[in-house]
């Protein structure tokens, strides 16, 4: 029988419960204490009257709020869930100790090697799988996850080997105790990849939108995606305009048709015209064959014209003519071609200002500015920074075949205080660089290299209150707080700011910026 006792945190309570069992000569088989104010007891089966009396005694014990029977102890439930999970997994999975000897194997692994549960424990991983030296891997100075193609019984598998670290108590560092090996059938993976098709809904799910303003943009995009009129997406560089454009295409009725993108920046007119409208054979000196342009290739689908604000006046005129009726002529041909294409444009410039300066056709502007989406910069999406960080870190760790690092407690404030002039693209690239150079299992502020001129040290109205000395002190403290994350020692920070080590040490002490033992080295 098993009981779950709900109780208060009181010294001696567990001993009193055990005394109740001893007084009744009840055979105790196990006791577990949970951190949530619960004690679990496992003892031999009792007669109904004896059991009822015991329950009443437990309820009368000071500090006990309730008691009930449960089918399993927490450890039993955890073991059963783990066993059920291993049994349900179609991929062969087994664990090994530091000598590479098999400790546990699921039924799929037993079937693959044609060994039952007892016999497979007599084998080592090196004996079961050729082509990978498990012993040498586990003896290496830094054991990291590995992935490798292996052949077993004439079948191709992707083998993934992950080290297992455990700690005996909270004060000790994790110790390597063995490894977990998973074998993924390449044939099965191929079938799974065929089913992994991006749909109109899943593409929008890839867009992180925690900030209310960004959520509003995504919801607006879902609605505008269903229309056929030209769509204009405005946003700073790196905000994800191309990703939003693709999501709108996939959600629309054209989602199964082609989606092509052309960057209009710095393209000569003849190249831009050929790319968009195509050309006939002989239209150019080296054009031996005719070529379909983007509009013709994407017939029935969508074309993204990125950096539309950089398009030349000549190409603006040709684009306007195409938008009127969907007809155009290939370069070097006389007959017209008609296609059905939705045009999506993206820009980081203010097209209305370009119109006023005479740099963008007014009629084209009003032709494009029918449905508009404005993407906010990352500095205005502060709540999205950490979710984006977690996604990028997980993705890059998987790509590089390394364990996913923990994010330090200081990293949140570090990333959210930065101005991010390059927006999401800059965050993505900074994290990729950090993971390629990462030492250890934790990502810290000093692992991320960012241009210092974009540090957010601006002062708002509240920071402008007080005397000049008070304002200066707040600004100085903000500078030191921010730079100390990237230069975490007084000597490094002093060298960075071009002052003496003593001056920096005094300033850090003055502003209460903590120093750890040895950080002045």
Swiss-Prot record:
PROSITE patterns with a match to the protein in the record: ACT, SIGMA54_INTERACT_1, SIGMA54_INTERACT_2, SIGMA54_INTERACT_3, SIGMA54_INTERACT_4
Record keyword Cytoplasm present: yes
Top-level taxon of the source organism: Bacteria
Stretches assigned to the PAS domain: 78-120
Residues that bind ATP: 235-242, 298-307
Annotated DNA-binding residue span(s): 489-509
Annotated GO CC locations: cytoplasm
Domain ACT: from-to ranges: 2-72
The UniProt record lists the keyword Transport: no
Subcellular localization, as worded in the UniProt entry: Cytoplasm
Record annotation: effect of changing residue 402 to V: Decrease in ability to repress DNA transcription
Listed result of changing residue 72 to C: Decrease in ability to repress DNA transcription. Loss of activity
This protein's UniProt keywords: Activator, Aromatic hydrocarbons catabolism, ATP-binding, Cytoplasm, DNA-binding, Nucleotide-binding, Repressor, Transcription, Transcription regulation
Record function comment: Dual transcriptional regulator of the TyrR regulon, which includes a number of genes coding for proteins involved in the biosynthesis or transport of the three aromatic amino acids, phenylalanine, tyrosine and tryptophan. These three aromatic amino acids act as effectors which bind to the TyrR protein to form an active regulatory protein. Acts by binding specifically to TyrR boxes in the promoter region of the target genes.
Subunit structure: Homodimer. In presence of tyrosine (or high concentrations of phenylalanine or tryptophan) and ATP, it self-associates to form an hexamer.
Name of the protein in question: HTH-type transcriptional regulatory protein TyrR
């Amino acid at each position: 029988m098993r009981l779950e006792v709900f109780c208060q945190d009181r010294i001696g309570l567990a001993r009193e419960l055990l005394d109740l069992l001893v007084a009744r000569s009840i055979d105790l088989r196990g006791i577990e204490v949970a951190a949530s104010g619960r004690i679990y007891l496992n003892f031999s089966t009792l007669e109904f009257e004896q059991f009822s009396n015991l329950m009443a005694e437990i309820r009368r014990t000071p500090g006990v709020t309730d008691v009930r029977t449960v089918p399993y102890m927490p450890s039993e439930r955890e073991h059963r869930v783990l066993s059920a999970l291993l049994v349900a997994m179609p991929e062969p999975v087994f664990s090994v100790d530091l000598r590479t000897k098999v400790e546990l194997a699921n039924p799929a692994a037993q079937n693959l090697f044609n060994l039952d549960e007892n016999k497979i424990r007599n084998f080592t991983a090196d004996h079961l799988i050729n082509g990978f030296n498990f012993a040498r891997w586990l003896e290496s100075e830094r054991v990291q996850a590995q992935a490798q193609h292996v052949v077993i019984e004439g079948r191709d598998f992707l083998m993934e080997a992950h080290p297992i670290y455990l700690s005996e108590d909270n004060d000790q560092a994790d110790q390597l105790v063995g490894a977990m090996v998973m074998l993924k059938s390449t044939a099965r993976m191929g079938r799974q990849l065929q089913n992994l098709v991006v749909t109109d809904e899943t593409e929008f799910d890839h867009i992180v939108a925690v900030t209310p303003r960004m959520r509003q943009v995504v919801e607006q995009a879902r609605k505008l995606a269903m229309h056929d009129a030209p769509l204009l997406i405005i946003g700073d560089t790196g905000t994800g305009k191309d990703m939003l454009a693709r999501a709108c295409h996939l959600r629309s009725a054209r989602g199964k048709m082609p989606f092509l993108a052309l960057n209009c920046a710095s393209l000569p007119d003849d190249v831009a015209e050929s790319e968009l409208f195509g050309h006939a054979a002989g239209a150019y000196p080296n054009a031996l064959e005719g070529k379909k342009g983007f509009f013709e290739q994407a017939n029935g689908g969508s074309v993204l014209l990125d950096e539309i604000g950089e398009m030349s006046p000549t190409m603006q005129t040709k684009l306007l003519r195409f938008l009127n009726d969907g007809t155009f002529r290939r370069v070097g041909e006389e007959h017209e071609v008609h296609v059905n294409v939705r045009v999506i444009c993206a820009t980081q410039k203010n097209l209305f200002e370009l119109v006023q300066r005479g740099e963008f056709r007014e009629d084209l502007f009003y032709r494009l500015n029918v449905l508009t989406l404005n993407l906010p910069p990352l500095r205005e999406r502060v709540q999205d920074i950490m979710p984006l960080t977690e996604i990028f870190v997980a993705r890059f760790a998987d790509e590089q075949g390394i364990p996913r690092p923990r994010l330090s407690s200081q990293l949140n404030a570090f990333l959210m205080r930065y101005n991010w002039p390059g927006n999401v693209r800059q965050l993505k690239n900074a994290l990729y660089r950090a993971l390629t150079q990462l030492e250890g299992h934790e990502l810290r502020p000093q692992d991320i290299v960012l241009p210092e001129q974009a540090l957010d040290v601006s002062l708002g109205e509240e920071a402008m209150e007080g005397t000049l000395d008070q304002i200066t002190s707040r600004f100085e403290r903000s500078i030191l707080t921010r730079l100390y994350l990237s230069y975490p020692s007084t000597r490094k920070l002093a060298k960075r700011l071009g002052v003496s080590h003593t001056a920096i040490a005094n300033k850090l002490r003055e502003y209460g910026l903590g120093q750890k033992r040895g950080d002045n080295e």
